[in-house]
């Protein structure tokens, strides 16, 4: 007769394996609109760990990319130091507007050279929000995009509740791809 637990039975049981969640860093230029939308998007899609940071200097694409590069490197160093590869980011995204920034091509190149993705809003993030609600008539100036958004969202003032836009996400993606194709024909960044 054996008292206690059956050792062979205990060794055969393993705790269920759960793959670590993907860790994504998003660095954006906007203090309110972009950050609020992206944080809401991250909460809605709970399958990843998304860390949204606002660039140190708002509104400058090169600063967004430099901050993302620095944060990516800090996470990689922490992962190496702690011996925990899950501290590294699986993906790094830089989110900025085209607006009238003169150094967008350099920012795109720096991001690509550092294995970072870019979500470029051309001309501005408000166009992305607008695409959730209706099709764009084509290439717009940022002031026109903002004006159209304010007509559709009466209380819009550089502040976003993601749930107001979630239902239109799939349509926004399709509409953005169409605009991207038009931009390529016009030889503009998408």
Short names for language-model regions:
Residues 2-4, 9-25, 35, 39-56, ...:
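C-terminal accessory helical subdomains adjacent to catalytic cores in phosphodiester-
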Residues 54-82:
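A broadly used, surface-exposed interaction patch
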């Amino acid at each position: 007769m054996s008292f206690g637990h059956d050792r062979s039975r205990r060794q055969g049981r393993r705790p269920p394996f759960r793959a670590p969640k993907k860790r994504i860093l998003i660095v954006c230029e906007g203090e309110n609109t972009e950050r609020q939308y992206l944080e809401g998007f991250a909460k809605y899609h709970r399958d990843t760990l998304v860390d949204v940071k606002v660039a140190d200097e708002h509104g400058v694409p090169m600063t967004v990319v430099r901050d993302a590069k620095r944060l990516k490197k800090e996470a990689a160093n922490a992962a190496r130091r702690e011996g925990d590869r899950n501290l590294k980011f699986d993906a790094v995204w830089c989110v900025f507007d085209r607006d009238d920034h003169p150094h967008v091509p350099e920012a795109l190149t720096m991001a690509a050279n550092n294995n970072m993705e870019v979500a470029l809003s051309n001309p501005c993030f408000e166009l992305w929000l607008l695409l959730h609600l209706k099709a764009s008539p084509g290439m717009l100036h940022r002031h026109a995009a903002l004006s159209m958004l304010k007509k559709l969202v009466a209380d819009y003032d550089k502040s976003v509740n993601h749930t107001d836009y979630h239902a239109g996400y799939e349509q926004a993606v399709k509409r953005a791809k169409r605009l991207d194709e038009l931009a390529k024909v016009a030889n503009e960044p998408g």
